[in-house]
Swiss-Prot record:
Its main location: membrane. It is found in: Cell inner membrane. GO terms for molecular function: mercury ion transmembrane transporter activity; metal ion binding. NCBIfam families: PRK13751.2 (NF010314). It comes from Pseudomonas aeruginosa. GO terms for cellular component: plasma membrane. This is Mercuric transport protein MerT. InterPro entries: Transprt_MerT. Keywords: Cell inner membrane, Cell membrane, Membrane, Mercuric resistance, Mercury, Metal-binding, Plasmid, Transmembrane, Transmembrane helix, Transport, Transposable element. Hg(2+) binds at residues 24-25, 76, 82. It holds the Pfam family MerT. Belongs to the MerT family. The chain crosses the membrane at residues 16-36, 44-64, 94-114.
Length: 116
C-alpha cells in the first residue's frame, strides 16, 4: 500500500532552498551576531553564483506545495490524511509560515545594506 502524499516534502524543499539562496547574505550577519570572525564568514561568498538556482528551486517547491495543499478535497480518498479538516488547516498554516520565511529570506539581500 502506498503512503498518502502530502505537501511536507515540497514545503521542506522550498524552505531549504530559500535558506541556501540567502546564505551568502543572511549567513554572515547571523554568524557575526553569534561571534564568529569575519575571515571565516568570507567563505560563504562561494554560494553567491548559485543564488538564482536556489531561488528557482524555492519558488518551484512552494508552487508544488501550494498545489498539493490547496487541491480539491474531492481528490482525497476518505481516510487519507489530506481529507481530515484539522490536518488540512495545519498544513495551510505551515505553508503560509514557510512562504513568509521564504519571502523574507529572498528579500534579505536587498535590505541587508541597512544592517551594515
Amino acid at each position: 500500500m502506498s503512503e498518502p502524499k502530502t505537501g511536507r516534502g515540497a514545503l521542506f524543499t522550498g524552505g531549504l532552498a530559500a535558506i541556501l539562496a540567502s546564505a551568502c547574505c543572511l549567513g554572515p550577519l547571523v554568524l557575526i551576531a553569534l561571534g564568529f570572525s569575519g575571515a571565516w564568514i568570507g567563505n560563504l561568498a562561494v554560494l553567491e553564483p548559485y543564488r538564482p538556482i536556489f531561488i528557482g528551486v524555492a519558488l518551484v517547491a512552494l508552487f508544488f506545495a501550494w498545489r498539493r495543499i490547496y487541491r480539491q478535497a474531492a481528490a482525497c480518498k476518505p481516510g487519507e490524511v489530506c481529507a481530515i479538516p484539522q490536518v488540512r488547516a495545519t498544513y495551510k498554516l505551515i505553508f503560509w509560515i514557510v512562504a513568509a520565511l521564504v519571502l523574507v529570506a529572498l528579500g534579505f539581500p536587498y535590505v541587508m545594506p541597512f544592517f551594515y
